[in-house]
């Protein structure tokens, strides 16, 4: 009775009417915090025009000379939370990587 191909059993863990499950759509509230295409473009444009804040330039210098931990501590003092500081550090590291790729 416990064969893998049997469906619609009367007893056991797999008992009940055999039915195919519909794919469940992701709920709309799960999109909180995800930037839209338009938002990404606008932020990219603003970054291109305004450049970096003074504290961000200082962090970029720290990251260039491999002072990652010092940069994180500095960012945490400026931004306020550890999690946001980690995100900002990651963002600025990606900027440095992009600059190196563009330079080659």
From Swiss-Prot:
Keywords: Acetylation, Cytoplasm, Ribonucleoprotein, Ribosomal protein
Organism, scientific name: Caenorhabditis elegans
MF terms (GO), sorted A to Z: structural constituent of ribosome
GO terms of biological process kind: cytoplasmic translation
Residues bearing the modification N-acetylserine: 2
Compartments, as annotated in UniProt: Cytoplasm, Cytosol; Cytoplasm
Record InterPro entries: Ribosomal_eL36, Ribosomal_eL36_sf
Keyword Cytoplasm listed: yes
Quaternary state and interactors: Component of the large ribosomal subunit.
The protein's name: Large ribosomal subunit protein eL36
UniProt-listed PROSITE patterns: RIBOSOMAL_L36E
Membrane-spanning residues: none
């Amino acid at each position: 009775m416990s064969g893998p191909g049997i469906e619609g059993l009367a007893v056991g863990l797999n008992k009940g009417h055999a039915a195919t499950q519909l794919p469940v759509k992701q709920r709309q509230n799960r999109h909180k915090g995800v930037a839209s295409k338009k938002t990404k473009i606008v932020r990219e444009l603003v970054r291109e025009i305004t450049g970096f804040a003074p504290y961000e330039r200082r962090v970029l210098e720290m990251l260039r000379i491999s002072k990652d931990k010092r940069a994180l501590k500095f960012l945490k003092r400026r931004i306020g939370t550890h999690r946001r500081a980690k995100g900002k550090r990651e963002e600025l590291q990606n900027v440095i990587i992009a600059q190196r790729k563009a330079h080659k």
